[in-house]
């Protein structure tokens, strides 16, 4: 199944949007100049606590740190972005998942200077089973 043709929702600029309707324009500044930030986040199902997002706060801190380096003004605070992660997992009914938070610049202007551009933020999540054998997850693994 293509990534643009899926059921579910994506958190897009503060709202849950149907997956197929989460769109951006081809003249978006980030598409042309590569000025955007993202993280790759995993969620795992646990017997004790259900689905847990691995090191969510650390990922969010890094996303905001990267945006700061690129002088992107994040339109949401860290707590809102953390809740967006939890919401897309919950709303999509995911147990084992990959999450992709992404901040990118809009299409208000074009050129090398990224001034006066709106920062958009999305959080998408999709089913992604663990690479680890379920038995190994229960008993643990040895790392040398």
What residues fall within each predicted segment?
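Conserved alpha/beta cores of soluble small-molecule-handling proteins
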Residues: 1-144
